Amino acid sequence: MSVTTTWGYTLTGVNTLPDMITTQEFNNFTANKYANDGRVSSDIKAAQSAVRNYCGWHVSPSAACELSTTFFDKCVSVVDRMLMIQLPATFVSSITSITIDGVEYDETYVLMPNGILRVYGLSWSHMKMWTPIVVKYTAGIPDNAADGIKELIAHRVTHALESSAGVQSETAGGVSITYNAAWINGSRATALADDNKEVLTPYRLRGVF
């Protein structure tokens, strides 16, 4: 049971990509204002897909992952006898196993906070261009620590629902919200604003090394 993602790795132990926020959680964020709106579920999926695609990995929740690569892959680099692998995640909580050419590696490795895995003491005989490398690891923000991401998605969905209805501003309980004019008329849940992207900065993959 696994799901192959569009970001180059596999989630194991699940048969669908887990949602980042449930419909009930969205209703809690919005005080059930849209509880009977049939667009909520599809807009949530659209918004969370936009977040994940912008960040370059599944972001949340924490999940068992597997990356299959080779020494030829752009996410792999070799310096002297040290192997560096850029895991497609910025929050990796643990490494389960590292297998090189079918043999599990049990020597020294270091996991960096930015998702770079450094593997030391490799034999030069292992370092052939197409040698298979498989890393099993756990990555993602735990569901109970992802309120900031959930709130961002909830806001993105709310903007989509309100702008599609032609609402440009509203006031409730002394709080006034003005919707970005660029989102009015045909706004979608996938349109991440600049302030959304700022919030997502810590979760976005920065590229290789």
Question: Whereabouts are the PLM-identified features?
Answer:
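Divalent metal-cofactor coordination and adjacent catalytic microenvironments
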Residues: M1-F209
